[in-house]
């Protein structure tokens, strides 16, 4: 029997079912009248187009798919069965063109779009998927899955605000569409606008918490409006009802973590993230949350293998590498830590803060020459961006205020503690506070990077004759004293003032011990020494008759102890008060402050131990004295808030 006679007897439908694409093409080549562009041939033309597309003859196949052919009976169904489904993974570009043609004539179905979009997303063709999703949303404006896809692709195209705006519009529909709520919540929670968070919360009564993902989303929504305890109750209630999974555990851990910075809250958060990892061990977000909580509760040994695993699969994530380096340093693996910090410094550039960490880590690893080289390059790079004079730079700070981006909870807390009673309008108060933040950081840059011009900031000093008189009245003789400070005011002016007064003192700071010049010679660096080494250096300083300067609200260790202060947990060390009690030394609270953009020096003699007073009693009384001093600085001019480091590190949004 000849091949020609065989094809006469086999129908195109049979060849289609046999997936005999060569046979189909041959059949229609022998019967050209069946695929002529005329009424009644639409079904055959569809089959011919399918055969061409399956043979990878894309241009021919697409040409055959005219609007009339596409809208013929069963046209879309045949294309879905024989082209879209089987070719989406292997020939996504061809399938995309078919889907776009179907969309253009309004016969496409949402599942066609979702299938090809999922494939294109895996290959990171975000712009292509975004265009497809936008067209699909016009065609299927009521479809919840297309809505979610459209918003997701907008975010991938850096159009998050547009995505949030669409979510906002949809969320305002009355009554709310139940199948749209999850997507609306996800995007409204990302918004920076409090009214969007309130809108999201208003949707919760209509949101069915039937799955652990939905419960997790409800927890996130409550956290976004500061209802942490309600969020915790919602999450724990879902667990009690048998809902459990990575999403819920992740969100519940965040609720505990955001509810307070106490060790107990961090431990509870860590426990939920540990469970989340059991459901999804490859989720980098959960791994890093868990590792961060472990580090902040002093469990560095447990965090290290988790972070190692994450870096092995995601070596391009700097925040993971930073946590890994910190954990290594805390357990004494200084060489390994220095390697990680050096890599961070290289990746982030010569002016990044990681060069400071790298220099300190190299010193701890015994690599002094490398540390000096890294820090010197860091100094030179920063110096190249500084103005010609200190005055020029200080005057330019007003123009930089609008670019300052600080955690809003710090400003909110400071406003409640100090700003509201100041009589200054909130906007002006914030502007002045941000100027103080810029000014102290500029002062640090200048003193570190322009050693030959280190005298220039001194022209901004007010009369400091009272400082010398104050210390003379202490009648120290051959003894030193303990000068305590906080991350407030013009903090970095402190060493400069004491140097100007030729006071025999050393200062404890996180600056690496490779800093050159007079300030460097008086430095006890906490960043390149163990805690035991720092304690020994401080004791030796005081025993030698020198004074010691310490900002006791600072700590490199993320698990450093905290105390309650105006409803927040702030870092606080009892080291100085215990030393004062043990060595019978006077203590002084001291902070350089800004007043009319000049630097003044606040000094206050702190309480001494009473006769036969126990250490516990004294340290408690001394702590209250210290916090009173800190409060007075906070409630002075807003320029003196400083807003970073020390007491500011753990400030969180309070449960509303």
Curated annotation (Swiss-Prot):
Keyword vocabulary terms for this entry: Polysaccharide transport, Sugar transport, Transport
| The keyword Transport belongs to this UniProt entry's keyword annotation | yes
Q: Which InterPro entries match?
A: TPR-like_helical_dom_sf
Q: Which GO terms describe its biological process?
A: polysaccharide transport
Q: Sorted alphabetically, which PROSITE patterns does this protein's record hold?
A: TPR_REGION (PS50293)
| Entry keyword annotation includes Glycosyltransferase | no
Q: Which domain of life is it from?
A: Bacteria
Kindly list the residue ranges recorded as spanning the membrane.
none
Q: What does this protein do?
A: May be involved in translocation of the Vi antigen.
Protein name, per record: Vi polysaccharide export protein VexE
The organism named in the record is Salmonella typhi
- In the UniProt record, the gene name given for this protein reads vexE
């Amino acid at each position: 029997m000849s091949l020609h006679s065989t094809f006469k007897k086999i129908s195109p439908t049979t060849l289609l079912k046999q997936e005999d694409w060569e046979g189909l093409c041959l059949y229609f080549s022998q019967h050209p009248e069946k695929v002529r562009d005329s009424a009644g041939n639409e079904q055959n033309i569809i089959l011919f187009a399918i055969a061409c597309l399956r043979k990878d003859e894309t241009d021919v196949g697409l040409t055959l798919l005219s609007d009339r052919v596409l809208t013929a009976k069963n046209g879309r169904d045949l294309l879905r069965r024989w082209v879209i489904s089987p070719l989406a993974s292997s020939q996504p570009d061809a399938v995309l063109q078919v889907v776009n043609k179907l969309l253009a004539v309004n016969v496409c179905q949402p599942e066609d779009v979702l299938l090809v979009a999922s494939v294109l997303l895996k290959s990171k063709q975000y712009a292509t998927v975004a265009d497809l999703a936008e067209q699909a949303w016009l065609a299927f404006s009521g479809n919840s899955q297309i809505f979610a896809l459209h918003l997701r692709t907008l975010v991938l195209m850096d159009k998050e605000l547009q995505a949030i705006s669409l979510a906002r519009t949809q969320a305002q529909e009355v009554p709310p569409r139940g199948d749209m709520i999850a997507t609306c919540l996800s995007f409204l929670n990302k918004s920076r606008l409090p009214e969007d968070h309130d809108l999201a919360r208003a949707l919760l009564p209509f949101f069915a918490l039937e799955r652990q993902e939905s419960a997790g989303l409800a927890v996130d929504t409550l956290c976004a409006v500061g209802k942490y305890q309600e969020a915790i109750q919602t999450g724990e209630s879902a667990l009690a009802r048998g809902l459990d999974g990575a999403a819920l555990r992740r969100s519940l851990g965040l609720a505990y973590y955001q509810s307070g910075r106490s060790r107990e809250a961090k431990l509870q958060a860590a426990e939920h993230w540990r469970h989340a990892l059991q459901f999804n061990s490859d989720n980098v977000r959960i791994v890093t949350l868990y590792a961060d909580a472990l580090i902040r509760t002093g469990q560095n040994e447990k965090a290290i293998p988790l972070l190692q695993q994450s870096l092995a699969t995601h070596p391009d994530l700097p925040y993971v590498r930073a946590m890994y380096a910190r954990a290594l340093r805390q357990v004494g693996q200084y060489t390994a830590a220095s390697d990680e910090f050096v890599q961070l410094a290289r990746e982030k550039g010569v002016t990044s803060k990681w060069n400071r960490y790298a220099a300190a880590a190299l010193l701890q690893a015994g690599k002094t020459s490398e540390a000096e080289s890294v820090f010197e390059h860091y100094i030179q790079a920063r110096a190249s961006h500084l103005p010609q004079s200190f005055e020029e730079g200080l005057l330019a700070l007003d123009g930089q205020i609008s670019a300052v981006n600080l955690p809003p909870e710090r400003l909110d807390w400071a406003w409640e503690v100090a700003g509201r009673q100041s009589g200054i309008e909130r906007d002006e108060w914030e502007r002045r506070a941000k100027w103080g933040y810029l000014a102290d950081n500029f002062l640090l840059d200048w003193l570190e990077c322009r050693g030959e011009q280190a005298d220039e900031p001194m022209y901004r000093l007010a009369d400091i004759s009272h400082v010398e008189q104050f210390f003379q009245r202490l009648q120290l003789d051959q003894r030193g004293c303990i000068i305590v400070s906080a991350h407030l005011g013009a903090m970095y002016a402190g060493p400069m003032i004491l140097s100007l007064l030729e006071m025999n003192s050393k200062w404890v700071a996180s600056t690496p011990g490779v800093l050159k010049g007079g300030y460097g010679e008086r430095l006890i660096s906490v960043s390149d020494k163990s805690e035991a080494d720092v304690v020994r250096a401080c004791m030796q300083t005081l025993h030698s008759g020198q004074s010691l300067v310490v900002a006791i609200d600072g700590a490199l260790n993320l698990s450093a102890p905290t105390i309650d202060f105006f409803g927040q947990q702030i870092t606080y060390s009892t080291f100085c008060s215990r030393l004062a009690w043990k060595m019978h030394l006077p203590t002084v609270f001291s902070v350089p402050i800004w007043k009319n953009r000049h630097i003044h020096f606040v000094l206050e003699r702190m309480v001494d131990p009473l006769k036969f007073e126990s250490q516990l009693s004294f340290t408690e009384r001394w702590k209250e004295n210290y916090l009173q001093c800190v409060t007075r600085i906070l409630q002075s001019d807003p320029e003196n808030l400083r807003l970073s480091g020390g007491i500011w590190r753990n400030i969180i949004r309070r449960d509303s």
